[in-house]
Swiss-Prot record:
GO terms for cellular component: nucleus. Residues 166-187 are annotated as: Disordered. Disulfide bonds: none annotated. The keyword Nucleus applies. Its main location: nucleus. One of its GO terms (biological process) is sister chromatid cohesion. Interacts with the mcm complex: associates with the mcm3-7 complex which lacks mcm2, while it does not interact with the mcm complex when mcm2 is present (mcm2-7 complex). Keywords: Cell cycle, Cell division, DNA replication, Mitosis, Nucleus. It comes from the Eukaryota. This is Mini-chromosome maintenance complex-binding protein.
Amino acid sequence: MTGGESWISDPLGVVQGLFAAQRPADGDWQKNVTDYFSAKLRDSDSAAAVPCLNDTPLHYLKPNSLVRFRCMVQDMFDPEFYMGVYETVDTNTSARVLHFGKYRDVAESLPQQEVDPDSRRNVTCERQTFYCVPVPGECPWVKDAYTSCSQAKVCASTSYAPSRQKRSYEEDEDAAPCDTRASHGLGEPKRLETEAAGAQQHLPSSCSSAPDLNFPLPGEKGPACLIKVYEGWDLFKVNDVLEVYGILSVDPALSALTEDREAVSALLDPSDDMDTLEEHRAHCPPASLVPRIHTIVTRKLQHNNPLLPPSLQGSEESKLFVSNFLSELSAVRAELLDFLSHALLGDSLAAEYLILHLISTVYARRDVLPLGKFTLNLSGCPRNGTFSELLYRVVQQLVPAAHYLPMTIENMNKLCFIPRKDYNANRLVSGLLQLSPQTSLLVDETLLEQGQLDTTGVHNVTALGNLITWQKVDYDFSYHRMEFPCNINVLVTSEGRSLLPSDCHVHLQPQMMPPNLEQYLGALLAASLPSLLNKFRTYIGLLRLLDYSISDEATKAVEDDFVEMRKNDPQSISADDLHRLLVVARLSSLSAGQTSLSREQWLRAKQLEQQRKNRLREQKHMNVNEL
């Protein structure tokens, strides 16, 4: 790192300077730290220079350097106390020095200094710990885009070797007598945990097998982290997607301290200490496997699309981005419709509805009713799952996060869909439906065969139905269920009408049937230029974020038109039809870049719905004739 990047390579040095320049008792230094790093990170190039834990191996990162991490809050632990400011006494000269404990897991002092636990100048503070995992189902193109934007300079290092760590501390330590210096082992009691009463102990890396990192989806990779949050933690909740900038802590002392606890635990009655030990294993895994990040700046992400500005409101740059894209939106929509029509074997009507589904999102809740959701059931799909899985690969190229769920009897009976509270470990055990907002979930019902659902299977199917209907998942807290609202785009592919509820049912009518589906769709994706796919990704991501409104005049026109429709066909037009028409009209308007309802888009919605219903009636008639 160059001198100009010392705020990245040695953020604790920056904090020390601001701490020393202020009266620690008044707390202004803490605000100054946040302001300093926030100002640095407002510059996009500076932010891109911070190494990212998502795409950088942990052993490439220097301990106590500034890192960033894009993640989902999987669990929130109980608040913990730590020594925000503590005083040491020099055993040789009796000189007293104040140190900061914020952004650290262990208290730092020089060899001849000892912490005075009874000092009146000590300040006990509180912080919150989030257990965070990489965004579940984050698509490869998103990871690649973020990686390509990174300007961080990292090289391999032996981050966990004590000798290397000691050298790093000594190189950076000359500026002030109270700077960081490594301990030489547990023989010297110079490094104390900064947590006050009830301090957490950490398990050694040699303990049993590698811990379960609690990822919601099977097969996920990437680091899990314990995020230490110091301010505003009540602004965040479970399943939020965050971008965290903070100080990386992989201190070997965290594991070394735990070895003492393991030795003590071995002398106790195992039955008495089992629950406590299990909780420590869950809350304090080895830092080499689950590093700690002490946050300085934490941002809740409005979306996880690297092609869009972080927010569409506020800056002139964002407004210009939106304006420029809207000017070419019509052409992009036409190309996307053609692309999806090919993916759906030439069915342009199904492609229209798939576009509406992809741009849908829950934008508000009225009592218990989620507004904006548009679960699509695409029936008539070729049986055996090949088509559905290939369609998922297409969707995966367009949205930031997605997951494919084969709805087999075995999966329904064996997979854990619903997160549950483990009271022994005092943690939330993840389930498959613990997903970040705006994740696309493709449920492949074409693989469903005759069989018996057990109790778990029934609960899982019920959970899927509640997710689709109410956009909520009832987490299992043993003694009660707790509702967690969600915002998941569910696409159900089926042979006949799905067993699951949906907002819209479209029967697929292929205009072609290639002899080799995999080769056909593979060629379609290969022929799509990255620049074109990026336009599709921007289109879908942007339209999810646009506001929409209906004027009083348009509302009156819709009401009058609906009354007329009921007069002409009272048997087949219901309140549900009006609701669906309004949803389709809203999404159709947004798909054309219009943020208010026009007569043209209302008529367009009516036309689409009429075509969809006619097709369903024809299919029903064909099925009856086949009986």
